[in-house]
């Protein structure tokens, strides 16, 4: 009896141990396939949404950076123009003969002078107060300014729109496609004048008496006269290197608003002179017709200029970044109008 009971219990125990193993089941291939499809349908739109958000955020970031750069650029230009003595209009720049009298564009680039003017440049601690002080020349002026006064010199300033022809340039990134343009500034400055000279043929200190910052530019023409502002503008050689003000200015005129001389006439409130004097509104507009992204309206008689810049924020992240009206927000513009307050003897 005990043996029979032990056998039954043993059999039941083995059956209980093996029972669950026989009833366990995994997922079928169809179930796995359905699950994978559902996961794909759910995850793919989510990933697309995330990628779109990241791209949108990136575009907004470069747009913001471009707007800030443009504003900083026009603020700098406005400060520069505020000391202008004479601003050249289109006819004036043409009469100068830029090919020989203005700086050439850097190697492997094309460049157009857009804004050209004369200004006063402050040189601090540069002229001995009188003949009794120990500092007899500008270069000997002590740093504390106790023996020398500040002075002003003339500077010819030219803003160019420059575009690289080499697609791998550091100014053309991402490389390839149409390179953005940039704005560069040239400055040609006269040496410090000697107020104590007794020789009218030598209005300046000798080069040996001047420090590097007082010496001026080798391209400055000492024969320049404001009575003939388009003659002897520079020496035509030994031009200084340009300083880049801002990059990622738009590069094409396709679909962009095109400025006109008539618009400049309206914006600057220019009244044509009475006959028999002639008037051509196109002389008020200075632009590079290949892009119209950096242009100036100039009224030389009033010493006033209105400058406009158009950036291309999309070119910071892609090579195919042509202007479209639906994407105009990514091509921000900045404008400033300034009347030069500088003057000879002021």
Regions found by a protein language model. Name each.
Residues 58-65, 95-103, 133-146:
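Short helix/strand-bridging catalytic loops that position acidic/His residues to coordinate divalent metals
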Residues 1-17:
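N-terminal secretory signal peptides that target proteins for export/translocation
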Residues 119-335, 340-346:
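Intrinsically disordered, low-complexity regions enriched in Pro/Ser/Thr/Gly and acidic residues
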